[in-house]
Regions:
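Generic beta-sheet signal
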Residues: 5-6, 47, 137-149
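Phosphate-handling substructures
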Residues: 64-127
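Active-site-proximal alpha-helix that buttresses catalytic centers in soluble enzyme cores
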Residues: 2-70
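Short, active-site-adjacent cap segments at secondary-structure transitions
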Residues: 14, 56-58, 77-78, 149-151
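Short hydrophobic/aromatic-enriched beta-strand-loop microsegments
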Residues: 29, 67-74, 160-169
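Acidic, His/Gly-rich catalytic cores of divalent-metal-dependent hydrolytic chemistry
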Residues: 186-190
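Short beta-strand scaffold positions
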Residues: 51-52, 126, 144-145
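Domain-level recognition of soluble alpha/beta enzyme cores
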Residues: 159-184
Length: 190
């Protein structure tokens, strides 16, 4: 009894090109480049497909060949609080070293803090853990999501603390007998 989980980071958007943290209410569409990247994704089309409610994830799914998906709020990006709408350089200029501390706390499953006015590490990881626990016991699942939930799943499933997954990148995990394995990290086809 095996589950194969394909975690897909949505394809590029204009805010991604600007390298700023997304606003919680922001719902940016894919950029022209993002539409091309999404159209080149190769995923098992018979798999059950889940998507974040955000347009960028839903468009990635549709262009990858998944017109019918289950929308799951748990797959939404982390709530970055007052970091949202700003670039890393802007945050460092305004807050010094504190943004690094906020992101490290958000990236820790037991983190009691996170970005001010945003999620704590514990809240964020609990949201992802609850979604992972609700997945079927076998078959194939494709989830179109964001960097934060994808990285949280890697931390929770295989203990990977640091990774960089490109926009349009895919992480393949396998679960058998209650144990997760990392099977593959795919770069977007270019």
């Amino acid at each position: 009894v095996t589950l194969t989980l394909y975690l897909v980071r949505h394809a590029p958007t204009l805010p991604n090109a600007e390298r700023r943290y997304p606003l919680l209410e922001e719902d940016a569409p894919l950029s022209p480049e993002g539409r091309e990247v999404a159209g080149r994704l190769r995923l098992p089309l018979q798999a059950a497909a889940y998507t974040s409610p955000k347009l960028r994830a839903r468009e990635t799914a549709k262009l990858a060949g998944f017109p019918h998906t289950f929308t799951v709020a748990a797959l939404t990006e982390a709530d970055f609080g007052l970091m949202a709408g700003h670039t890393w350089a802007e945050l460092e200029a305004r807050f010094g070293a504190r943004p690094r501390e906020w992101i490290e706390a958000l990236g820790h499953p037991e983190g009691e803090t996170g970005p001010p006015e945003g999620e704590t590490g514990r809240q964020f990881h609990a949201r992802i853990q609850n979604w992972l626990a609700a997945l079927p016991g076998e078959g194939e699942v494709v989830a179109f999501t964001h960097a934060g939930p994808l990285l949280a799943a890697l931390r929770l499933c295989v203990g990977l603390r640091a990774a960089e997954v490109a926009l349009g990148g895919v992480v393949v995990l396998k679960r058998a007998q209650g144990q997760w394995w990392l099977r593959e990290l795919r770069l977007p086809h270019g």
